[in-house]
């Protein structure tokens, strides 16, 4: 089956892992995603309905606008994908406009421009909540018109919420399946890792996410979580069935060294015996 790409570039996006994720994702009527990101799993599955959430208000506002005002949004966004906008001076002017803009529609248009023209498709904010990704210097950024229309069509069966992972997971019922793609865990308890939003994701929150998954599966609601394969994640997900995906992603650790890390898929499935928590 042909894979559908997201219209946003996204750090840590799950497009390369779709086959593995779908292989282990349980069946159900509704998919709940507390960390929707660019939405690759949503775009490549066939649930009857979707509950999609993220803590990034710009992202959720964008998705609701694409869902409800598709043609208007595509037309307005296309106007920024021109040779004359592909220069640093214009980029920084539009970035400044984004950071002061109060109009949700214009802000959503600028968000797509910044995503495609900014460095590596990063979505990063400073402590004041200002988008601060530098200019990317790409030859000709791609305007994702087909991807926008596909997203909008698929989104007619989705509800988008800007809220915490705990709040969105609380929306799951017996007809739901939950897929969690939290910010990647650090390599160790002392390692630093990138925060893509001003609210960084702590070790306490990583462990709390696993506890919520355990509670949901005890109520017969399956949960699949993806993360780095480390000693920490194996401790957090010790009550799940663990599947290792040989991605061998190279990431920075303390001291500037690079370390190869696989991906871990932790499946909490009702009716599957798991060891007692240590």
From Swiss-Prot:
GO terms for biological process: DNA replication; DNA restriction-modification system; methylation; mismatch repair. It catalyses: a 2'-deoxyadenosine in DNA + S-adenosyl-L-methionine = an N(6)-methyl-2'-deoxyadenosine in DNA + S-adenosyl-L-homocysteine + H(+). InterPro entries: Ade_MeTrfase_dom_2, DNA_methylase_N6_adenine_CS, M_m6A_EcoRV, MeTrfase_D12, SAM-dependent_MTases_sf. Its EC number is 2.1.1.72. S-adenosyl-L-methionine binds at residues 10, 14, 54, 181. Keywords: DNA replication, DNA-binding, Methyltransferase, S-adenosyl-L-methionine, Transferase. SUPFAM superfamilies: S-adenosyl-L-methionine-dependent methyltransferases. GO terms for molecular function: S-adenosyl-L-methionine binding; sequence-specific DNA binding; site-specific DNA-methyltransferase (adenine-specific) activity. May be involved in methyl-directed DNA mismatch repair, initiation of chromosome replication and gene expression. Belongs to the N(4)/N(6)-methyltransferase family. This is DNA adenine methylase. It comes from Salmonella typhimurium (strain LT2 / SGSC1412 / ATCC 700720). The lineage of its organism: Bacteria, Pseudomonadati, Pseudomonadota, Gammaproteobacteria, Enterobacterales.
């Amino acid at each position: 089956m042909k894979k559908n790409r997201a219209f946003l570039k996204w750090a840590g996006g799950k497009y390369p892992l779709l086959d593995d994720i779908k292989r282990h994702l349980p069946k159900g009527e509704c998919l709940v995603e507390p960390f929707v990101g660019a939405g690759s799993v949503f775009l490549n599955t066939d649930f009857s309905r979707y509950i999609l959430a993220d803590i990034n208000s710009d992202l959720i506002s964008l998705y609701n606008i694409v869902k409800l005002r598709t043609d208007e949004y595509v037309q307005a966004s296309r106007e920024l994908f021109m040779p004359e906008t592909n220069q640093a001076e214009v980029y920084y002017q539009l970035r400044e406009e984004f950071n002061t803009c109060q109009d949700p529609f214009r802000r959503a248009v600028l968000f797509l421009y910044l995503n495609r023209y900014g460095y590596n498709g990063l979505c990063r904010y400073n402590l004041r909540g200002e988008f601060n990704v530098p200019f990317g210097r790409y030859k000709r950024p791609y305007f994702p018109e087909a991807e926008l229309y596909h997203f909008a069509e698929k989104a007619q069966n989705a509800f988008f919420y800007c809220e915490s992972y705990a709040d969105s997971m609380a929306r799951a019922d017996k007809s739901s399946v939950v897929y969690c793609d939290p910010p990647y865990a650090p390599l160790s308890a002392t390692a630093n890792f990138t925060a893509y939003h001003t609210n960084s994701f702590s070790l306490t929150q990583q462990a709390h996410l696993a506890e919520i998954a355990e509670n949901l599966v005890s109520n017969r609601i399956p949960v699949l979580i993806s993360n780095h394969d480390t000693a920490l994640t194996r401790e957090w997900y010790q009550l799940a069935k663990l599947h290792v995906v040989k991605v061998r992603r190279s990431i920075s650790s303390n001291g500037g060294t690079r370390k190869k890390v696989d991906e871990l898929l932790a499946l909490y499935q009702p009716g599957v015996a798991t060891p007692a928590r240590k």
